[in-house]
Amino acid sequence: MEEKEGIKDSSLLEKSNVPESINEDISKTTDVDLNSDGKKDNDTSAKDGTPKVEEKVNKSSGIDEDEVVTPAEDAKEEEEEHPPLPARRKSEEEPSKENPILQELKDAFPNLEEKYIKAVIIASQGVLSPAFNALLFLSDPESGKDIELPTQPVRKNPEAPARRRQTQLEQDELLARQLDEQFNSSHSRRRNRDRATRSMHEQRRRRHNPNEREQHHEDSEEEDSWSQFVEKDLPELTDRAGRSLQDTANKVSNWISDAYRRNFASGNEQNDNQHGHQDQQEWEPEIVDLSQGGKNSRPQQPERRRFNSFGVQVGDDSLESHGITLHNEDGFEDDEDVPPQLPTRTKSGESTGKVVAETTYIDTPDTETKKKWQPLPPEPLDTTPTKVNAVSRNKKNPDEDEFLINSDDEM
């Protein structure tokens, strides 16, 4: 470096002694060369080994080639003069491969060997506080006088096993249990309340009568057995009874259907046809009687009879309905036939106490036509009613009263 600096100083002194004309020519030539592809000229001059600038300078001034300095050399010299830039540090420091707990304990206890420190770390399972206390006791035994040694091993809480994912059926079952507890809690509370009240009453009784303890114990056992029977055994019994009834019903129905198929379905068609007509005739009057009885069984309002001014029932033309019969009170007429009479039997001593037949008259149909009864013509009605007419109208003849006339219905 010192030799190069000496060469630079000598070259600068020589340049200062060159006349001004030479400097002007050099500046012109250098400006032209740099503006018009200076790189190409420099390359060609480097290949040929005869740069143009040096030739012109040598021709005009007669300076040696060794004394001339090119601009490339000047740039190199300037770079050598400036100090190199410092290397950039990496932003991310590489993590140390050594265990940080081990390194920390080494720094805290440099006097102890590394194997003891590792043994303490293994025993403490990486917990710093017990490891630090153990290493402190190794370095200074007097510091561990106040520390009590454990007599029993430390119990660790068992880690809960990984909960497996529940299926849809399990989720539904869990939800059903929650709903049952929520909505049926009232029934359970009522039951617990009843038990509490019973227990209170029984305790009061025991205080008054200490002999009832044994009886209370027996009663409690009976209640427990009864509650167990109602809650567990009764549903099973009901299920079994229902199943047995269903089975028996199915068996009976199958047996009846088989018997019907054997006896009735495969019967003789001729017997069915013979008895069919008779059965139909026997059943018809019963059906009619039932229908009539059903009609008559209904309550009916009594019919109201209406009579006209002549004492005749309205809507009935027959004489019998009027309640009037015509007969001769004097006896039989001459033309009418007298019915025959049976001879009377004399009573004997042997026949006393026996029933004797008496003569009876036998009615015979009348051959002659009887006279029909005709009603009397009505009386003329006065347009102007008077007291006499009104009284006469209101009065009734006792012979015309329907209740005093002997009718066929009363007979």
UniProtKB/Swiss-Prot annotation:
One of its GO terms (biological process) is autophagy. Changing L376A: Impairs interaction with ATG8. Residues 399-411 have a biased composition (Acidic residues). Changing L136A: Impairs interaction with ubiquitin. The modification Phosphothreonine is found at T70, T167, T346, T352, T364, T367. There is a cross-link at K15, K59, K76, K156, K354, K396 (Glycyl lysine isopeptide (Lys-Gly) (interchain with G-Cter in ubiquitin)). The keyword Cell cycle does not apply. Residues 1-102, 142-411 are annotated as: Disordered. Residues 1-12, 25-58, 209-219, 230-242 have a biased composition (Basic and acidic residues). The modification Phosphoserine is found at S21, S36, S91, S220, S309, S318, S348, S407. Present with 623 molecules/cell in log phase SD medium. Connects the ubiquitin pathway to autophagy by functioning as a ubiquitin-ATG8 adapter and thus mediating autophagic clearance of ubiquitin conjugates under starvation conditions. The CUE5-dependent selective autophagy pathway plays an important role in clearance of cytotoxic protein aggregates. Not required for cytoplasmic to vacuole pathway (cvt), mitophagy, pexophagy, or ribophagy. The ATG8-interaction motif (AIM) is required for the association with ATG8. This is Ubiquitin-binding protein CUE5. The lineage of its organism: Eukaryota, Fungi, Dikarya, Ascomycota, Saccharomycotina. The gene is CUE5.
